[in-house]
Amino acid sequence: MSSLLTPSAFATEDVRRTVLDNGLVVLTKEVHTSPIVTNMIWYRVGSRNEELGQTGKSHFLEHMLFKGTDRFKKGEIDLLTLKNGGANNAFTSHDFTAYYFNFASDRWNIALEIEADRMVSCTFEAEEYESEKKVVIEELKTGLDSPWGLLLQEEEATAYKVHPYRNPIVGWLQDVERATVEEQQAYYRRYYHPNNATLVIAGDFNTEEVLAKVDRAFGAIPSGPPAAPMLHKEPPQ
């Protein structure tokens, strides 16, 4: 019974940690049980980084990273994923924003190319931004239509009086409605840098070959300014 209650050693053994010159942390683990590779990049930015009046920026940005880059135009990321038999998705939390791809091990390199490009070259076309804003607002309203969604929002807003954890990850409706594309671009350039990210790759591959590919894809991307520390202190209640 005790083995069921303790973390599996397999989960962390043989994980290799590499840091590129630009600060990108790379965690790799070879798993040869099936011919699949999972590529996941985590940015250290979430709703906790948002000031009141600017909520929802992290989640909205997650949406925009699927809407095109300088190299991959609107719809091409999902199309390439499907054509190569893969899967992709993303999520935003209070503390992180993460994007992942699953591919067969003979064609997963496209994930590196996409992630490297959208780290620095996400396009913010005004028309596309306004269109996606409607999608995000509808997502927000759908969540509030659920009794559990409304309860969670009120619970967090009550539990935290100062800390940004009190704000919903999708943002407050009025903040999302009045947000501008220029604000979203500035937020992107502030937090999406190699030294504010961790790239996790696990699956059927050779580690040395993978690290060489990662360096080719991300190595030339310059570091960004350090993200400002979050100093919000929640008073005793």
Protein language model annotation of sequence segments:
Residues 5-47, 71-107, 142-196, 220-237:
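Non-catalytic beta-strand/loop surface segments
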Residues 113-118, 212-218:
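Short amphipathic alpha-helices in soluble, non-transmembrane regions
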Residues 185-217:
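Non-catalytic, conformational "gating/processing" segments within enzyme and secreted inhibitor domains
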